[in-house]
From Swiss-Prot:
Gene: aroQ
Gene Ontology terms describing biological process: amino acid biosynthetic process; aromatic amino acid family biosynthetic process; chorismate biosynthetic process; quinate catabolic process
Reactions this protein catalyses: 3-dehydroquinate = 3-dehydroshikimate + H2O
Gene Ontology terms, MF aspect: 3-dehydroquinate dehydratase activity
Full protein name: 3-dehydroquinate dehydratase
Keyword terms, alphabetized: Amino-acid biosynthesis, Aromatic amino acid biosynthesis, Lyase
Active site per database record: 26 (proton acceptor), 103 (proton donor)
Organism: Pseudoalteromonas translucida (strain TAC 125)
Coiled coil: none
Family, similarity comment: Belongs to the type-II 3-dehydroquinase family.
Organism lineage: Bacteria, Pseudomonadati, Pseudomonadota, Gammaproteobacteria, Alteromonadales
Entries under Pfam families matching the protein: DHquinase_II
The organism's place on the tree of life at top rank: Bacteria
């Protein structure tokens, strides 16, 4: 059997409030429910998936630094840091691990300040507006890219 790919899902600020915060935009499911379903999907693909959520930019950066040479792919929903965090972008670039940027809502159909991302130009791809299915799409695409690169 081939070695398992190792993926990390990183979720930024306020995503711990999913299911309570603006369900019309983000849905009624909790982050725990979404990550549990994604972990099951990863298991079926022979992928070792871990996930991490923090409201702290520092904690997110440190977790990214910890992935160096330990993770094959990152799926990140930087949430509000999408529009503000050069430091988080630089952390991703420093570990040189491919990543997908995921957003539950369609950020381009929202307020103008949400249209700019510090990540999209260095991401392998951007998935937005699909709700929790965006994580599944990123998982499948990451596995496909990893399989095709080996």
């Amino acid at each position: 059997m081939a070695a398992k790919f190792k993926l990390l899902v990183i979720n930024g600020p306020n995503l711990n409030m999913l299911g309570k915060r603006e369900p019309d935009k983000y849905g009624s499911r909790t982050l725990s429910e979404i990550m549990s379903e994604l972990t099951c999907a990863a298991d079926s693909l022979n992928v070792e998936l871990t996930h991490f959520q923090s409201n702290s930019e520092q904690a997110l950066i440190e977790r990214i630094h910890d992935t160096w040479q330990a993770i094959d792919y990152i799926i990140i929903n930087p949430a509000a840091f999408t529009h503000t965090s050069v430091a988080l972008r630089d952390a991703l670039l420093s570990v040189d691990i491919p990543f997908f940027e995921v957003h539950l809502s369609n950020v381009h159909a929202r307020e103008a300040f949400r249209h700019h991302s510090y990540f999209s130009d260095v991401a392998q791809g951007v998935i937005c507006g699909l709700g929790a299915m965006g994580y599944h799409a990123a998982l499948e695409a990451a596995v496909n890219q990893l399989q095709n690169s080996n």
